[in-house]
Amino acid sequence: MAGVAGGGGNGNDFQWCFSQVQGAVDEDVAEADIISTVEFNYSGDLLATGDKGGRVVIFQREQENKSRPHSRGEYNVYSTFQSHEPEFDYLKSLEIEEKINKIRWLPQQNAAHFLLSTNDKTIKLWKISERDKRAEGYNLKDEDGRLRDPFKITALRVPILKPMDLMVEASPRRIFANAHTYHINSISVNSDHETYLSADDLRINLWHLEITDRSFNIVDIKPANMEELTEVITAAEFHPHHCNVFVYSSSKGTIRLCDMRSSALCDRHSKFFEEPEDPSSRSFFSEIISSISDVKFSHSGRYMMTRDYLSVKVWDLNMENRPVETYQVHEYLRSKLCSLYENDCIFDKFECCWNGSDGAIMTGSYNNFFRMFDRNTRRDITLEASRESSKPRAILKPRKVCTGGKRKKDEINVDSLDFNKKILHTAWHPMENIIAVAATNNLYIFQDKIN
């Protein structure tokens, strides 16, 4: 199989090829440099990453020109800023990590760009803007900014704007704090572009982008007695078109769809999505691997996708009793769950994403492998984010994992997989076949090569 047909929706088969890689080649990677979130903006011209050191790096797409015809999927650093700093909660004697958990872009309204970034406790709204002119010729200041003696000023000057080198500024416009007792795992901007939600383990809050000192609690699953706690919220997202509808997933593998029109506190769901468990396959690990790590609405709003430890499921919003599609991501790991439990990998939170036309989906795996599934043809492919195939326009070879004793030449044995190399965060350009894949401290960008 050559590839998974994607973004353009034209159904042509194509191959994925290497575009670029950002990040250091070091063997010893500093914890702070590990990428923790990746997100394209609405146009796909900007790509933001957050890391465990609290930094946000924004990449801007290069304009394709005649001298460089293959720069279509090339992104270069546009702005870097420190979004969050480590803090200490003295009341609870807890360290608050600076790690960026999520980044969400706001739709562009003017020349500036806005994004939300969050760590475990605090959400910030950032404005990213450009300056290429500066004012000169002030009356009370000289060109170096020093104050002039008013008694020596003999003529009145009108300040003028002079061109300067382009400068990109990132400034915090709002800080939304003190609303979450537990760790924030999700933020999602509403389709009304005025409100957004933030979710932690037990509660979901609704915020207005202009108001920082109060939020509305719309879901609260905290029991009166914490010993009765049986599940936690793992992810939440607003519907892309209906501003009153949102979903949240749980550690029990269920998804609840809520309608804010029915009541202010959405503790009663409108729809409850759950797949009945097969009793014959129940094991000690069943509950752990059924925990949902990510939920994403399709662009059309008709479907939603959930990721658990071993699979990706696509649900039709009109059918609650089972998913319409199930894709096995790395079924060969089912026999390895015991060792994955011992090394804590079983608790890894893999994300998933749709392509622009909702015809294909992508999610990560171990050994720096990532998987793509074509929903129309039901074909799938395993690719690897590796510097070994990082020549410009180098075509990615499909990878295969074997579980038996005999291994073919181009296959890798399941026992040889490196579980320290994992692709948790991926993003797909909203309109084209350009993908971003975070592998530890490196950001890989791949694009299609149509056959």
Swiss-Prot record:
Oxidoreductase keyword on record: no
Keyword terms, alphabetized: Cell cycle, Cell division, Cytoplasm, Mitosis, Repeat, WD repeat
SMART domains (UniProt xref): WD40
First and last residues of every WD repeat: 30-69, 95-136, 179-217, 228-268, 287-325, 342-383, 418-451
Compartment(s) of residence: Cytoplasm
Main localization of the protein described in the UniProt heading: cytoplasm
Physiological role: Substrate-recognition subunit of protein phosphatase 2A (PP2A) that plays a key role in cell cycle by controlling mitosis entry and exit. The activity of PP2A complexes containing PPP2R2D (PR55-delta) fluctuate during the cell cycle: the activity is high in interphase and low in mitosis.
Self-association and partners: PP2A consists of a common heterodimeric core enzyme, composed of a 36 kDa catalytic subunit (subunit C) and a 65 kDa constant regulatory subunit (PR65 or subunit A), that associates with a variety of regulatory subunits.
Family: Belongs to the phosphatase 2A regulatory subunit B family.
Protein name, UniProt field: Serine/threonine-protein phosphatase 2A 55 kDa regulatory subunit B delta isoform
Species whose genome carries this gene: Gallus gallus (Chicken)
